[in-house]
């Protein structure tokens, strides 16, 4: 069973009876436990990114699950392993996206798809999870966390005296705030239009919050940073 995008701007359609393709060398069959819903995927469904050249298309690029079976040459994971599913290419074999069948219709997928009960992915799209990590949280490790925290760790690389402002306290923004907290940044400023998200940002490590519906964020940031 999977959610299929047949036409941009239209709702996904949940289809049953989809045929799982046979594993090729370097591929892994995973039973999906949880999937994140990335903003970029919503944009694709709505058609905000232009026409989808891969219709009908299986979507979802961040999730968690259990390895069911591995193809030839796969050494990174084995059946029973808990894994994160991610669009980010890691270690291991890289393969083309699997093609699924629904009757006579071919359903396309990218390197990973998670809006489904089962998914066939490349070995390099699986990351083994420690047993104690909850599956529902692990799903976010496939995109939101490495995107947000990764910007802080790999691009900004702030020192402890740094002030950081994060606009938008969604999954990526909160992950960036976490990254700034790990770096022990002096000021971590969260900006959003929803008080509920700003409250969560404080739980994640924001030292200051700004609701830009009621305050001028640029002026307020200057006041907070005193420059």
Task: Put a short name on every predicted segment.
Residues 1, 27-29, 163, 187:
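Residues that mark the start of a beta-strand
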Residues 89-167:
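NAD(P)H dinucleotide-binding glycine-rich loop of Rossmann-like/cofactor-binding domains
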Residues 39-46:
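Cytochrome P450 core scaffold surrounding the K-helix E-X-X-R motif
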Residues 147, 172, 180:
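Hydrophobic/small residue at the entry helix of a nucleotide-binding pocket
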């Amino acid at each position: 069973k999977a959610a299929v995008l047949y036409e941009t701007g239209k709702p996904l359609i949940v289809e049953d009876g989809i045929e799982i393709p046979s594993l090729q060398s370097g591929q892994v069959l995973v039973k999906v436990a949880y999937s994140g819903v990335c903003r970029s995927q919503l944009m694709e469904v709505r058609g905000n990114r232009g026409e989808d050249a891969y219709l009908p298309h299986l979507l979802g690029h961040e999730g968690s699950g259990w390895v069911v079976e591995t193809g030839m040459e796969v050494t990174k994971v084995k059946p029973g392993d808990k894994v994160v599913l991610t669009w980010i290419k890691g270690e291991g074999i890289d393969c083309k996206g699997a093609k699924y069948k629904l009757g006579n219709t071919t359903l396309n997928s990218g390197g990973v798809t998670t809006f489904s009960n089962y998914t066939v992915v490349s070995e390099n799209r699986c990351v083994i999870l420690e047993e104690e990590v909850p599956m529902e949280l692990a799903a976010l490790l496939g995109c939101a966390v490495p995107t947000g925290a990764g910007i802080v760790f790999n691009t900004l690389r702030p020192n402890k005296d740094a002030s950081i402002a994060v606009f938008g306290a969604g999954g990526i923004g909160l992950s960036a705030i976490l990254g700034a907290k790990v770096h022990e940044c002096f000021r971590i400023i969260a900006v959003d239009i929803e008080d509920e998200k700003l409250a969560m940002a404080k739980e994640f490590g924001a030292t200051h919050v700004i609701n830009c519906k009621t305050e001028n964020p640029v002026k307020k940031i200057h006041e907070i940073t005193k420059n």
